[in-house]
Amino acid sequence: TATGIFPSIASYGMYSFQVSDIRGKYGASTYIRSRVWTCALAVALCIGFVAVSALTGENPYSAQQSVCVLLFLGYRMVESLTDIYNAIDQRSGRLDIVGKTYAVRGAVTLASFTLTLWLTQDIVLTLALMLGASLVVFFVYSLPQARAFYAPEQPQNARVAALLWECLPLAVYSFLN
C-alpha cells in the first residue's frame, strides 16, 4: 500500500548502481543529494496522496491511520537515507559497518517499538518513538561512520539530475517490482 509504494520512489533502485560505480563517475555527495531529492519527492507524493484522498472522501484511512502512514513513511525515509551511507561504507571495503548498522538499527527500533507499544498501547506514539530511535542511530552511528570515507562537497544539480536520469530504468524496475 502507501508505505510500500513511496519508499520505492525514495530508494530509486540506486543502491546497486552506487556500489558498482567503481570508477567513481558520481561522487558520494551527488548520491547523497539525489537521495535527498528522491526522499523529498516520496514524502510530498505520500502527503499529497493522503491529503487528496481525505479531501475527496476516497481515503481508506482514518485520521489516526493517516498519521501512522506518515510516521512509518518517515521511518522508511531514514532507512532510505541510511542506504546511501551504507553504500559509501561498502565501496570503502567496510561491509562490517553496514552489518553493524542494520543490527543496531534493528535492535533499537524493535526495542523502542515493542516497549512503547507494550507500555502505552498507543500506536501513534510508538511509531513516533520508533522514527526517533531510527534517527538517533542514523545521526550517532551511520552518518559518522560513512563520513570517514568521503569529503563532503557541494554537488552540482546537473550532476544529480544526470545520475537520476541514468538510474531511471532501475527506479522504474524498483517501482514495478
How should these model regions be labeled?
Residues 26-29, 35, 74, 88-114, ...:
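Alpha-helical transmembrane segments of multi-pass membrane transporters/permeases
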Residues 15-18, 84-91, 95, 115-119, ...:
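C-terminal transmembrane helix end/exit motif
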Residues 2-7, 38, 71-75, 86, ...:
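Alpha-helical transmembrane segments of multi-pass integral membrane proteins
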Residues 1-7, 63-67, 123-128, 162-166, ...:
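Interfacial/gating helices of multi-pass transporter permease domains
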Residues 41-49, 102-122, 136-141:
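Alpha-helical transmembrane segments of multi-pass membrane transporters
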Residues 96, 100, 123-125, 140-177:
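Interhelical loop/hinge segments that connect adjacent transmembrane helices in multipass membrane
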Residues 1-22, 76-84, 137, 174-177:
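Small-residue-rich midsections of specific transmembrane alpha-helices
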